[in-house]
């Protein structure tokens, strides 16, 4: 058996299947190391969202992942609600929603939200939009579906939260809620 000279052996093709992001010697440059740190911070925030969004109806998101000037956009495609900005008012809106849901649905408001679908996509300036379609069964005959979009910066901080496409499935009839209107008096 001939002696194998490892100096001339090219190991790079062996590394490609193990590392799908491999692009030649770029994996050693500082820029890519910075991107890995960026991905770790964003990944931590996404993990926190995956764990806490199902409980958001009775527990607030932690301040550590929210920007002090977080922007809340409610139904941008169907209503002209003003954009809400600031951590205090953001937390106040969700606390008010929790109180309203608990007074309307009682103990059912403590049911967790089901995350039906998740998607994250990159935006400009190394920001990430993390979207999740959520479903909440308020009662046996009342079910809600909506989409949350969280815009996350490179430090893993949420700077914008968009709530969109709210649908109510009441007694097996789905209706898109285009405005927050009360039920007709029967």
From Swiss-Prot:
Keywords: Meiosis, Mitochondrion. Coiled coil: none annotated. The keyword Mitochondrion applies. Transmembrane segments: none annotated. InterPro entries: Mug163-like. The keyword Mitochondrion applies. GO terms for biological process: meiotic cell cycle. It comes from the Eukaryota. GO terms for cellular component: mitochondrion. It is found in: Mitochondrion. Has a role in meiosis. This is Meiotically up-regulated gene 163 protein. The gene is mug163.
